[in-house]
């Protein structure tokens, strides 16, 4: 039975970043359900926008994005739509439009060969025994059993590691649904859509490489029905759909209290969305995935006597920032306050009257 210093479950942005940073410094094994290349197998449904905080992480690490990861077009504003109030506002944002699956595979490709990576693998069982973490996983057609001093859960919203460590922990979840359509709009755009009759979270649209992606986060019970209802409503705001080319869905976490951020225990650690590190106001998680990976790297290399306590302290600033996103989310999803903010025109950039796309309903009071 092979033994490692660190076993990482999941190679999204958080797991890939940590594996790369620990390579050559610790003996690391990493398991991931995505294939090593190509479009077959698992791919994460995601709008694919790289926020400024994530961009700063790449600057810090001296990395530049390859052209095959970057999507077309690059748009510098977000149309914010309040459906009930028939209001549309235009806010400047500095996102980078990316192909999320290509981005994830590129992040994995940066992991040095000294890390033992198993692609297209499935973690079957984890447990702690004799001060070691035991992991049974299936890869290359057969089951393997390894042990590790440290276990890292970088396995996202449905984290197996989080469920094992905190079996009674409850965090609000939504089903994220999105569909891809052939782009019909004369000018591509991003949008953020609020409709409290549909969801107390939000919906979105993104133009990407000739496609129009429309999605949102909805209650788990009847998410598909709510998604369909919102699509019908958006025709009043000049959204054009047609026949769906592809449909995707996944679970997304929605932290709503301080206790929703969990970092691990007993030499097991959680990073990225597995720890609840996702923005409640935008559902953006890549920047927090990269930041938490960097924090855990520093903890591992310092080898403190109480690693879990050190990681908890080191993530305090990150957790405070994310708690601020919870407060912001409550403001954005409060109909009266949101309507007041949008009516005030603060930070709104008006577009020319003859601009070819004005996403307002016929009853708009702009």
Curated annotation (Swiss-Prot):
Signal peptide per UniProt: none
Domain of life of the organism encoding this protein: Bacteria
Pfam families: FAD_binding_3 (PF01494)
Database matches in SUPFAM superfamilies: FAD/NAD(P)-binding domain
Gene3D superfamilies on file: FAD/NAD(P)-binding domain (3.50.50.60)
GO molecular function: FAD binding
Similarity annotation: Belongs to the CbrA family.
PANTHER family: CONDITIONED MEDIUM FACTOR RECEPTOR 1, GERANYLGERANYL DIPHOSPHATE REDUCTASE
Protein name: Protein CbrA
Source organism per UniProt: Shigella flexneri
